[in-house]
């Protein structure tokens, strides 16, 4: 499972006949999307996760023709001819390339619901907390242009809390740390809303970049982001492991220019990942300092919950607990928390009188 991979596209389709809206215009679906920097995840009610692909698009820079989207495009990163470029149209949780993002959203909506004609769906999109109004408008416009009938937005930490099984409607403080691919959102939630939050433009992708820098500096070895991600998943840690792990790393020797293989240890990844991990801990500390006393007491009792693909980095749970003195736990399935939370939220929007 991808250790970032943090941020995701989550598509939730309500299969209830009453919502399907069969008619002369085809099938209508209610869809929830987590606009993630690193991956796309598709969740269908009653079926669970049915699609998981990277949020990568490959296109011809001469003609602007899209060549591949998702996993196929990811495999092209670093291996394309000069005229073909594989890019991530989302950076740090927001749209960096509007046109490509719009086409990518449209592609995954169609892939999720099938090729058949369907009425324009209502779509709920997850966005990082504290993004600007301009960035929010860009998300809304791209989603409308991708085929939405109505668009609503929900902050990622709120969706993550719902998906983690936290009852956010109660007057009780809950802290969620959602670590995606491009952003880390730290939030205290009570009575269905965010009380205090901080959005850090550092997450799973930055773990990969830290490993790339370390390999270049310490071993004079140039590696790609896919290799760095593999290192992170297999032996990466931000807390001392009981048993040291190793991995053979292939790259290009910066001195000779020739291919080279070295053996990397988990202790070395601890050194490589120390700075980005400490920045996340510092963000948690900042939010705790701004939290009202009564809610701080709740968090002390209930603990901190980690969600998102970045929460899978070994040792992060222990590091936060050691630095804050507060019990810290990772959600049961951190990578799908936002998917489930988005689905429950859009169900609530369509049926606000439901008990849930």
What are these language model-derived features?
Residues 2-179, 187-305, 311-356:
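Nucleotide/phosphate-binding catalytic cleft detector across ATP-hydrolyzing
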């Amino acid at each position: 499972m991808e250790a970032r991979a943090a941020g995701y596209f989550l598509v939730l389709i309500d299969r209830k006949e009453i919502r399907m809206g069969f008619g002369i215009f085809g099938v209508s679906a209610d869809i929830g999307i987590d606009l993630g920097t690193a991956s796309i995840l598709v969740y269908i009610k009653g079926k669970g996760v049915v699609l998981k692909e990277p949020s990568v698009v490959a296109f011809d820079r001469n003609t602007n023709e899209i060549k591949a989207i998702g996993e196929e495009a990811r495999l092209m990163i670093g291996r394309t001819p000069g005229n073909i470029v594989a890019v991530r149209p989302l950076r740090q949780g927001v749209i960096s390339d509007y046109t490509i993002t719009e086409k990518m959203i449209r592609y995954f909506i169609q892939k999720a619901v099938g090729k058949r004609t369907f009425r324009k769906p209502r779509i709920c999109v997850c966005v990082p907390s504290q993004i600007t109004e301009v960035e929010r408008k860009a998300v809304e416009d791209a989603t409308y242009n991708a085929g939405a009938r109505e668009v609503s937005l929900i902050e990622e930490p709120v969706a993550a809390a719902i998906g983690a099984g936290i009852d956010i409607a109660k007057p009780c403080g809950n802290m969620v740390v959602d670590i995606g691919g491009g952003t880390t959102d730290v939030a205290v939630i009570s009575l269905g809303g965010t009380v205090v939050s901080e959005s850090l433009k550092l997450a799973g992708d930055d773990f990969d970049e830290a490993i790339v820098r370390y390999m270049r500096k310490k071993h004079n070895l140039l590696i790609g982001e896919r290799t760095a991600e593999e290192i992170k998943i297999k032996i990466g840690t931000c807390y001392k492991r009981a048993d040291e792990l190793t991995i053979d790393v292939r790259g290009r020797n910066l001195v000779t220019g020739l291919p080279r293989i070295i053996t990397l240890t988990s202790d070395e990844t601890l050194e490589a990942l120390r700075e980005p991990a400490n920045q996340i801990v510092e963000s948690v500390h900042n939010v705790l300092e701004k939290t009202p006393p009564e809610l701080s007491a709740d968090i002390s009792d209930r603990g901190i919950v980690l969600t998102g693909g970045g929460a899978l980095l070994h040792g992060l749970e222990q590091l936060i607990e050691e630095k804050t003195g507060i019990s810290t736990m990772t959600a049961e399935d951190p990578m799908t928390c936002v998917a489930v939370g988005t689905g429950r939220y859009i169900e609530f929007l369509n049926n606000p009188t439901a008990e849930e």
